[in-house]
A protein has these predicted regions:
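Catalytic phosphate/nucleotide-handling subdomain of diverse soluble enzymes
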Residues: 190-196, 201-217, 355-371, 440-512
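Short, charged recognition helix plus adjacent turn
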Residues: 63-72
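Short alpha-helical DNA-recognition segment
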Residues: 15-34
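A short, Lys/Arg-rich alpha-helix, primarily the initiator
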Residues: 1-13
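DNA major-groove recognition helix of helix-turn-helix/homeodomain DNA-binding modules
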Residues: 45-60
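An N-terminal structural lobe/cap that precedes and organizes the functional/catalytic core
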Residues: 163-190, 194-255
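Accessory "access/gating" subregions that flank catalytic or transport cores
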Residues: 160-174, 297-323, 329-343, 347-353, ...
Length: 522
């Protein structure tokens, strides 16, 4: 298209006459006609005036850049926010970020209204841009004066701030170890499956379900065939799935059990001296993005963007103190029976890729507790000893102390669990590490060494049901051994476990127990 053709095209598209163009350019209408017939060319001043009249760039008029290219040059390229997975859009969780920053001691209260205002916007590119600004604000915010906790994420600082009387390595009784390792594996798997059927349910509907199915207080698996029809149709929780004891012959995959198998594979490949970067690379290599949630999915996406640990845990990650690292602790306890120091160190190297502060401590604590449970028969003492491996002035220690103080003070079981739910709103903190750790500790103490009672209490209380019962079952299974886990818990799935791990798929639990011993002796 010639320059004359373009002048004619834009003039007619704008509904302008030659006379009006001539008047604006201070030329005759005959001059405009000559421009359009390419018998003469407008001066530079006239080209500039024409581009203003047509509201286009000068190069679009003079060089011949078409409309599509002009729009592309002006536009920004953005993702389709409606297609992103829930946990991938930082701006969707700005109030989670605000609350998280506030709780970890940052002086951000003056920005509360701003966070709320941006949170109310619809998802589009400018909301994400505003989210980036808010992220910079909280990242660089100072700590509040007189904040009572000290919660480092650096391992050297963690070790400086823990109890110096932490226990040394103690050799386990080899004649009992086979039973203990099997108990830990099955304890975790059965507990996870018990809570998986109703993962995400709120306590009002959970209590109604248990009562209407004759399972209150909870004492057995949930069966699909027992759920009342009106609950299937009208409940807020979606019961329409097949993760029920009467519908399976193999434990379905779940992130809580995926990680246990995944980290066995990690140790096989990298050995006991693996590094955080090894874990990050292994995540990408061995599982799809859909296998990760909240902090883990954020970290996974950060790996792809080029962030390495520990930055991968910190960049636009409002879930950095959620439960995701805590549920990854178990295998490090399994392969270090009686050696909580090494178990906690391994847990740190894993946790730091996706979590900070109490998110890290949750994994370190339960790795240490499981290692201690291999050589300690007193649950109260084991809980106390494991606390010594994390910072003593942390919110995590405070949470555990709230439970142990109630237990030691004779507070009855019902009251203790009620206090947990009164402290933490289940809609806001359902997946946060602190309330769920409280539930696990209370379940272990008030469960009185009874496997069924312990995992059922962990589920019946609500919040992150599968995570809590899995962790409680793992700790108690290690302490009491496989003989303490009744057949009613193990029989529905025939020793088989499904995973989402590439190249692994369905596994035989017995084989995984055998590999654990290889790693203990590695």
């Amino acid at each position: 298209m010639t320059l004359g053709n373009r002048i004619y095209k834009y003039r007619t598209e704008h509904g302008l006459s030659r006379e009006s163009i001539a008047e604006k350019c201070s030329v005759s209408s005959q001059s405009v006609q000559k421009w359009e017939s390419d018998n003469s060319k407008p001066s530079l001043e006239n080209l500039i005036m024409l581009s203003k009249i047509f509201n286009i760039t000068l190069d679009a008029l003079a060089i011949g850049v078409d409309e599509g290219v002009r729009e592309e040059r002006k536009a920004f390229i953005h993702p389709d926010y409606s297609e992103e997975r829930l946990w991938e859009t930082y701006a969707d969780f700005l109030m989670t970020e605000y609350n998280q920053s506030l709780e970890e001691g940052k002086d951000v209260e003056e920005y509360e209204k701003l966070f709320k205002a941006v949170s109310c916007l619809k998802n589009f590119e400018y909301k994400e841009c505003l989210g980036d600004i808010l992220f910079d604000i909280v990242t660089n915010a100072p700590m509040r004066e007189n904040y009572e906790f000290y919660e480092p994420s650096d391992l050297a600082e963690i070790k400086k701030s823990r109890d110096p009387s932490a226990m040394n390595k103690k050799e386990p009784n080899q004649s009992l170890l086979q039973s203990k390792i099997a108990g830990a594996w099955y304890g975790r798997i059965c507990g996870c499956f018990l809570g998986k059927s109703i993962e995400g349910i709120k306590t009002d509907e959970l209590n109604r379900l248990l009562k209407e199915t004759g399972n209150y207080p909870m004492h057995r698996y949930i069966k699909k065939s027992e759920i009342p029809e009106d609950m299937l149709c009208r409940a807020r929780f979606n019961f329409d799935h097949d993760h029920y004891a009467d519908l399976i012959d193999c434990v379905p995959s779940d992130d809580d059990t995926n990680y246990t198998v995944l980290y066995q594979e990690l140790i096989t490949k990298y050995g006991r001296d693996f590094k955080p970067r090894d874990v990050a690379a292994f995540w990408i290599e061995k599982q799809p993005k859909s296998a990760y949630y909240t902090a883990e999915e954020t970290a996974y996406c950060n790996f792809i963007k080029g962030f390495t640990p520990p930055a991968s845990a910190m960049y636009k990650n409002p879930f950095r103190e959620w439960i995701g690292a805590q549920i990854r602790a178990d295998y490090f306890g399994y392969i270090n029976p009686g050696d909580p120091e090494t178990a906690a160190d391994m847990a740190y190297r894993d946790a730091v890729i996706s979590h900070t502060k109490n998110g890290i401590y949750g994994e370190m604590y339960f790795a240490a507790l499981i290692a201690i449970a291999a050589v300690e028969n007193d649950m109260r003492e084991a809980i106390e000893q494991a606390l010594k491996f994390i910072p003593q002035k942390s919110r995590f220690v405070r949470s555990v102390r709230l439970i142990t103080d109630d237990y030691d003070g004779g507070v009855d079981e019902s009251k203790c669990f009620s206090k947990i739910l009164s402290r933490w709103d289940e809609y806001t903190y359902g997946c946060h590490v602190l309330p769920n750790a409280e539930i696990v500790i209370a379940s272990l103490l008030y469960g009185d060494g009874d496997y069924g009672k312990t995992i059922c209490r962990a589920v019946q209380t609500g919040l992150d049901t599968d995570c809590n019962a899995a962790t409680a079952g793992s700790v108690l299974g290690m302490m009491t051994g496989i003989s303490a886990i009744g057949e009613e818990w193990t029989s529905p799935f025939g020793g088989k476990l499904e995973t989402q791990i590439f190249g692994v798929g369905k596994v035989n639990i017995g084989d995984r127990i055998d590999i654990t011993f290889e790693h203990i002796n590695r």
